Amino acid sequence: MKKRLFRLGALCCAAAMTITTSAQALSVEEAYDILQRSYVDKLPRAAQDAKSLDELFSYTDDYTYYMTAEKYQAFLQGVEGDVSFAGIGAEITYVPEGIRIVSVLKGGGAEKAGLAAGDIIIAIESESCAPGGAEHRAKLLGEAGTSVTITVRHADGTQADYTVTRALVTQTNTTVSVTGGVGYIDCDSFGTQTGTYFQEGVRGNDSAVHAWIVDLRGNGGGLTSAAVSALGAFSGEGDLIYFVDQDGESTAQSYSGKDLTDKPAIVLMDSGSASASEIFAGGVLGTGSGIVIGTRSYGKGVAQVLYDESNCPYLHGDAVKVTAYRFYCAGGNTTDRIGVVPTLYIPQDQAVAAARLLSGEKTKDSAYLRLVLNGCDFYIDIPAGKESSSAALEAILAALTPDAVLYWGENGGERKLTLAQAREKCGFAASSALDFSDVADSEYAQEIDSLAASRIVFGDGGKFRPDATMTRAEVCALLAQALDLYSTANGYFTDVAKGSWYAPSVNAMAAIGLVSGVGGGKFDPNATMTQEEFITVLGRLVEFVNLDAREFLDKNPLAILQPLPKYKSFSHWAIRSAELLTNSVFDENGDAVNMYCMSLEDIEPQVPILREQAAAALYNALRTTGVLKY
């Protein structure tokens, strides 16, 4: 790649705190030059006319900012792994409303005050900290023993003031333990020593375990090199992460050693798992090294580079952290904004118990259930599971998709079961509470129920209405659910009213380029979407999430595709997406894999798309690209 201006390597971290500022040494013009050369997205024209650093950096993402010399030293301390600092004891990230707590550190003031991951600090000492930025973060550090009063908005919308005592917090970011033949790696962040902890922990204990659980809940990230080293213990050699810069050039970060275990990893994840945690979790899925359970991760799929006096003549003790790359996990998918979708969606109150149930051994003396997930075998001792954690067992069975591969083992033999049969054998209802009452006769019932298990589609009163057409607004809602991406921004379209039920979905999809208007600044949200419109939108989604799709489109311009007879009835703007969905991926026999819900020959491009067709096509696309890994 052209730009290699690293000091610490690519950083994927939510830095914890920083301290008071000093005089600015960097001019707006110099900062603009840095951003022009390395910021991952094209800056708007208005950025050229910025009058201050604050105004200039408002045109970038939350992870791009300027640091004075004092702030830079605090930042360096915060990413070194096992560190000591005087602060409230929380890993944070910036959001428009203020400062979001990604995780609380053990022994810190935030933990003692009862703060939790997902809480948003909206004011510090009664002063608003919206939008979140380094200048607000500085107020959270101070001398040990002093206190700071913060106003916090909780996930349920309530807010309260907390007086938090700053303290020196020493955090060892990774611990490895073995209990009952199960290895448990608890990793709070990816620091300079994390890769070593993983490598030594797995190497030293693998002979004593039959399963590995890796707990990344609340892990806000850290160093990509540490995530790659940790992942390599399970995956072995290969390219484990890809960075793509503003020019579309990509480079891989590889692991060259052998894997240290043949046991699959069970990765625990939640909404506080971000950045390097997502590299690890996505890499486990992409390399077939295990599964991910819990809830969807945070969605920080961008990497930063650090400019300081060692690599930039504009800087003298101060620094600029710049989002310079989007990263793609080992399977070729980005986690940018969409996060990692778990193999099994398990409520957090059952996640650890579910992981331990999945860590069982094949038994001779009692009945067991063997699950084949992402190419790996997992055994559940049924009598022990029902006795120790019936709720977790039920949660696992509720999270499985209709096509799950299941075997019942008993008296030395095995037989294959359907999901409904497995539920009944375990003493639960054959159907899940997530199942729809009106899709049994749909040819796409399996795809619809699979999306429901992954919390991507939701019905109305237990019904899905498979034969109904979809409006443009409804399609945006479906895609927003799939990507877990919504936007409070407004102004993309004059006919998408702020406060309308579909505005967050439409605006989010417009912001990432999945949908566009109909002309005159309008979106026409209530118009029915056609097959070719949905093909176009779905193709853009695949391009957004998958690196291989981007490369395919670069090699297949419209000028080559438009003359093909098979696209005679298509509008020109739908052709590249149609080709991407039907002729870009090939199976082991060399046959094209169709990501859409029907063949090109069966498509009538201008007729409305049905809800069942949209769900099936979305499912096929997410499965083919590896966003969904079962």
What are these regions (language model features)?
Residues 2-25:
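Sec-dependent N-terminal signal peptides of Gram-positive bacterial secreted proteins and lipoproteins
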Residues 4-5, 409-445, 458-473, 480-505, ...:
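Feature responds to low-complexity, polar/acidic, surface-exposed segments characteristic
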Residues 26, 83-131, 192:
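PDZ/PDZ-like domain segments forming the peptide/carboxylate-binding groove
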Residues 27-80, 149-151, 155:
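Interdomain regulatory linker/hinge segments that flank or connect interaction modules
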Residues 62-103, 163:
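PDZ/PDZ-like peptide-tail recognition elements
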Residues 100, 135-176, 323-324:
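PDZ-domain C-terminal substructure recognizer with occasional recognition of PDZ-binding tails
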Residues 120-151, 199, 226, 301-311, ...:
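PDZ domains, with a preference for the canonical peptide-binding region formed by the helix
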Residues 177, 182-213, 217-433:
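C-terminal "post-core" interaction segments
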